[in-house]
């Protein structure tokens, strides 16, 4: 079965060949370019595909820049009715609206980015979890290799959405990183390398973008919403759900080892609201200062120039909020249970009892875990 490079629209017969191709300069340098043929108005991705199309296109009706811009405007006009506004540059340098914005979802559901089903995650991601597989990953691990692996899968500028997907699909890699390094290193990658608009902290209060309003062609107003850091602390846990599932399976397979106990200590740090808040303060930045910014933060608003390219902080909040991570009521309950379960495993007597009582296999349901946890009074 052919595998297609998402950047170049080019097919390969194996995943290894796709990976090798995506490391090449040709793929990396031209992956952000979309060619629009003026003969047939087709949009083509990939350097080789562009050259092939130019040589073989039989289109006879030229398309003008103005027509392309008109199409963009019509498309963006329709988008505005879905509460999405766009801003950017047309082919001749003229301003058009292609600025991507989605309303912040702090307390209500959105699309599922992190695992919707805890059971399915355990079955699919960590079926063969063993201490050996974890130790093998740790042996050649470094902060740099972790960052490079993320950058390879999600070339910069990557988003928090990319990071959350990486956590879901690469739970063993994340677990190895936590064992080899610490939360501070992990947060440094998440907050320093990811291209996003910063959280604003003023007098220990945390603000995120709640609404973006277009004032005119170049000026926009960002309305800020103050949030409780406990919400952010809870939200960050969503990243670690696949890793927690991996940890549960690892305990059931090989319970008596220092490696898994060390991981649980790290997980306890994640649940420490004071520590999370301190890390948030370390890696967040004040409101950026530019000559064209009129700072009126006292009114929880400020104006900036529309040509400044950034990813609104609402993207970050939406993708890791408990609204998106735990859409279903059952999932919310499960998240708390998983943490309680892992906390209980640090106590030797409860850990032994739990491992003895819970036998996880392909047909297990989360209800069985609930029953056993009630017996343990977790």
Curated annotation (Swiss-Prot):
A zinc finger (C2H2-type) spans 3-25. Gene3D superfamilies: Classic Zinc Finger (3.30.160.60). One of its GO terms (molecular function) is zinc ion binding. InterPro entries: Znf_C2H2_type. The keyword ATP-binding does not apply. Belongs to the IIV-6 302L family. This is Putative zinc finger protein 302L. It comes from Invertebrate iridescent virus 6.
């Amino acid at each position: 079965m052919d595998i297609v490079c998402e950047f170049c629209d080019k097919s390969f017969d194996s995943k290894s060949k796709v990976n090798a191709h995506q490391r090449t300069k040709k793929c990396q340098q031209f992956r952000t370019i979309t060619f629009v043929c003026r003969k047939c108005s087709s949009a083509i991705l990939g350097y080789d595909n562009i050259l092939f199309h130019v040589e073989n296109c039989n289109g006879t009706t030229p398309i003008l820049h103005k027509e392309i811009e008109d199409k963009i405007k019509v498309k963006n006009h329709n988008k505005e009715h879905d509460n999405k506004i766009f801003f950017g540059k047309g082919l001749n340098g003229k301003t058009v609206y292609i600025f991507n914005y989605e309303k912040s979802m702090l307390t209500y559901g959105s699309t599922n980015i992190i695992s919707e089903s805890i059971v399915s995650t355990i079955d699919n991601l960590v079926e063969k979890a063993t201490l050996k597989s974890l130790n093998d990953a740790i042996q050649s691990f470094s902060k740099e290799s972790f960052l490079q692996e993320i950058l390879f899968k999600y070339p910069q500028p990557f988003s928090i959405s990319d990071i959350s997907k990486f956590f879901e699909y690469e739970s063993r890699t994340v677990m190895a990183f936590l064992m080899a390094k610490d939360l501070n290193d992990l947060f440094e990658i998440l907050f320093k390398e990811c291209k996003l608009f910063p959280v604003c902290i003023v007098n220990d209060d945390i603000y995120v973008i709640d609404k973006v309003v277009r004032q005119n062609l170049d000026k926009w107003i960002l309305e800020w919403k103050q949030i409780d850091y406990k919400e952010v602390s809870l939200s960050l846990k969503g990243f670690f759900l696949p890793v927690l599932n991996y940890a549960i399976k690892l305990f059931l397979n090989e319970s008596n080892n220092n490696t898994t106990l060390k991981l649980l200590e790290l997980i306890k740090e994640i649940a420490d609201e004071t520590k999370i808040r301190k890390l948030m303060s370390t890696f967040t930045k004040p409101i950026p200062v530019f000559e064209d910014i009129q700072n009126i933060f006292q009114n929880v608003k400020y104006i900036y120039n529309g040509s400044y390219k950034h990813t609104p902080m609402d993207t970050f909040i939406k993708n890791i909020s408990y609204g998106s991570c735990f859409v279903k009521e059952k999932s919310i309950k499960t998240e708390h249970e998983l943490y309680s379960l892992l906390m209980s495993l640090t106590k030797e007597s409860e850990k032994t009892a739990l491992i003895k009582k819970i036998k996880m296999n392909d047909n297990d349901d989360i209800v069985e875990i609930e029953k056993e946890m009630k017996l343990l009074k977790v």
